[in-house]
A protein has these predicted regions:
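Extended beta-solenoid/beta-helix repeat architectures
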Residues: 101-208, 223-224, 250, 268
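Generic, low-specificity signal for short hydrophobic/alpha-helical stretches with a mild N-terminal bias
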Residues: 24, 64-68, 101, 105, ...
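Glycine-rich hexapeptide-repeat left-handed beta-helix
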Residues: 165-166, 172, 178-343
């Protein structure tokens, strides 16, 4: 789940609601990305020990006895880290998931380049191009790639997800389970149960769960003057430097945009927003925003609950009390951001 909020704030808002602590559990730092050396160190932790590196705790087994870790690791602290580091993580995951396994056969109607392609059972792909020479391609169980698609790896396509007719993937892209994606996608991460099913460009971007991108919508990922792109931070309450020339859209869970929506480079959309209207909306759209370039108002929490319930029920998922409590907690904790923009 991505709520755009940086890890510390995210944990404070809902982490303990959905994942209460249990004795004997191994606790991993949110946003910690694995490598073989780190995995070995974590597996060696004993009850009561905590693995640390400098000021960062990485993992613990219900204790605070500090064990120093001096090896390499990556820790996601900003949303742009997610797509920036995705290429390397795709290759790590591909090696881990395919070790000792045999891919299902690739239908003869496809054009195939490179060897790093793996299909799980039930994958449906015909009359498409699979090029793994620049990155691996992993297609999970029950996923589907419609004819005419061109895949330039890396790509990880989640179980029961679909790439629509003529989809173009430019690499370093992850699509979670039960999602539909189409158009042009470059270096983006789409969480599960989200749709960008139509033409339009999504690049250097992150979409949370239960998002929907209307047909013909696009995001810019490069400023016309080629300057560094800044991105709004909930922690600093300002637009922070990313050090990136390419940075597109970051959209949190349960948010949606209408057809032909255009997002400027470095746009952050909070939780449960509904964006529509001609022109570019502002670069930070607070959680529970309703509107677009012509103006924004606060989206009713009650209506947000009803919409989330409808959306999840379409995928046979229950919008239970825990999910409701999380959305309510985010609504309360982000009120200050709407207040500063005239929404509340």
């Amino acid at each position: 789940t991505i709520a755009v909020l940086e890890p510390l704030m995210l944990t404070h808002v809902w982490g303990k609601i959905k994942f209460p602590e249990k004795k004997g559990d191994l606790h991993l730092r949110g946003g910690l990305l694995p490598c073989h050396e780190l995995i070995k160190a974590i597996n060696s932790l004993k009850e009561g020990e905590m693995l640390i590196s400098g000021e960062d705790w990485l993992a613990h087994r219900n204790g605070e006895k500090r064990i120093a870790y001096t090896g390499d690791f990556l820790l996601v602290k900003r949303p742009e880290n997610i797509f920036s580091w995705n290429k390397e993580q795709l290759e790590f995951d591909f090696d881990l998931l395919t070790s000792g396994r045999k891919s299902e056969p690739i239908h003869h109607s496809n054009q195939v380049f490179g060897e790093r392609i793996f299909l799980e059972k039930g994958v449906d792909i015909k009359a498409s191009v699979l090029n793994s020479e620049e990155g691996s391609i992993y297609l999970a169980e029950g996923s589907k790639i419609m004819p005419g698609s061109v895949i330039n790896g890396g790509l990880s396509l989640g179980n029961s997800s679909t790439l629509k007719l003529g989809t173009k993937i430019y690499g370093a892209t992850t699509v979670g389970p039960h999602s539909k994606v189409g158009g042009e996608i470059n270096n983006s991460v789409v969480w599960g149960f989200s749709n960008k099913a139509h033409d339009g460009f999504l690049g250097n971007a992150v979409l949370g769960q239960w998002c929907n991108i209307g047909a013909g919508s696009n995001n810019s990922n490069l400023k016309n003057n080629y300057d560094e792109i800044k991105l709004f931070s909930y922690l600093s309450r300002s637009f922070d430097h990313t050090g990136l020339q390419f940075c597109g859209l970051v959209m949190a869970d349960h948010s949606k945009c209408a057809i032909d929506t255009s997002f400027n480079s470095g746009t952050v959309v909070g939780v449960s927003c509904n964006i529509f209207g001609s022109g570019f909306p502002r670069n930070f759209l607070p959680d529970f925003s309703w509107g677009g370039p012509q103006g924004l108002k606060e989206y009713s929490l009650e209506k947000a609950h009803l919409t989330a319930k409808k959306v999840m029920s379409r995928r046979n998922m229950e919008y239970n009390q825990i999910e409701s409590d999380i959305l309510s907690a985010i609504f309360s904790s982000t009120r200050e951001f709407r207040g500063g923009t005239g929404l509340a």
